[in-house]
């Protein structure tokens, strides 16, 4: 096992990365190794997808499957070894079908990619794990060095984050052939184990630029189906009655669940990154979407244990449900998996609803505590002139984007302390689950404009980018000249690709933490600092002083 893709990875003087019987996330060595094997199979599939496009062949089954299967290897998504192997087998079957399509056009069609003809050696998980050793990400570290390995992993993990957003967009009916062609090209190239530093740096920026397009179609998918988010108050306390909790990012799953629970007497609560759903008109119209429950994903083993109903996980993040003994009432969807828990294959939530009706639910309603969400792209753009007016009248000094992933490290209290230290004449724009560090606190307003503005899920960084570009255009300056600072927390691969997106768009002087990615060497950090001004957090006082004086 070797995995260094998330922020909580093991760090020792000898090196970074989880390389024991089990990773810090709970992923076993078996599952981790089989995920490496799956990635190799997906690289071979992408190699043939690139070749097929040379013949004018676009196989939508391949395009639909590839990013989804890659998503299953993201942190805290799928811990179920047999299902990972199932994805690998499906990848190989699709590859062979695509290869046959190519050969039907050109009998001499061939693909030089080293992953292009990969076959699984056995049905036995142990044998497959031994085969996976050929594809462990750091297998040639001694030959290429830590810097090249780090850049390879930056590209691989960044592309993995983009694949997750591609799957979210696909679920909502969004497809862009250019994006998929670019995805396959990059995925296939990474299967050649590239070792050129400049080419890898260029690839990282290409992934960032591609992901900006992915976030654009994801935004289109969400707003076309569910309307543009508008500011909405959400209760974060319990309401009497039977209940279901839904977590993750998949708004379509939430919509289906709301439709199927309407009139049943079962209330629905959002959790984690599902919180922004309350801002969408077509979702909040359901009166039994009664509120948001819990806090950051890392607290779920305590909070889920206390929730008196079933829980549905639609995407990341799931952690061991046996710890809180709620494994008999947690359900996984799509690419999510945990050994031994119930998995919903389709869109029928009937078994979950039936379980909810058998459980007690909340015995009474608590005193409501309301927070505001729903500052989507249209709302943000509608406030652009107000922001400019406040800046010109010196009522608004600075905007801080404080957001990103949450996690368990105590150092993440930095982001709570930073938000509460922001001066009263400054505004906080937030997104993703890092907001749970401070989103239930009171921040007041500036002439009626809330000082805490919740822009949505992690992918809604797109809205923040569009706002920044709009403000810069209206003020006749560059984005980096705005009174705007980005203070970002990271945990997994979606955050990595958001960072690459920002860097590829030329955004500079980002402050990130609580620690640098484990695959970033001192040399790579120095390069990113020199090119983009990227740096790690220090202390709240020092960072605040520096950002306000910039």
Curated annotation (Swiss-Prot):
Free-text comment on the cofactor: Binds 1 [2Fe-2S] cluster. Binds 1 hybrid [4Fe-2O-2S] cluster.
UniProt: [2Fe-2S] cluster binding residues: 3, 6, 18, 25
Gene3D superfamilies named in the record: 1.20.1270.20, 3.40.50.2030
PTM-bearing positions, type Cysteine persulfide: 405
Keywords, ordered alphabetically: 2Fe-2S, Cytoplasm, Iron, Iron-sulfur, Metal-binding, Oxidoreductase
Superkingdom of origin organism: Bacteria
Gene Ontology CC: cytoplasm
GO terms assigned for molecular function: 2 iron, 2 sulfur cluster binding; hydroxylamine reductase activity; metal ion binding; peroxidase activity
Keyword presence, Iron-sulfur: yes
Subcellular location: Cytoplasm
Similarity comment text for this entry: Belongs to the HCP family.
PANTHER family on file: HYDROXYLAMINE REDUCTASE
Protein name: Hydroxylamine reductase
Originating species: Salmonella paratyphi C (strain RKS4594)
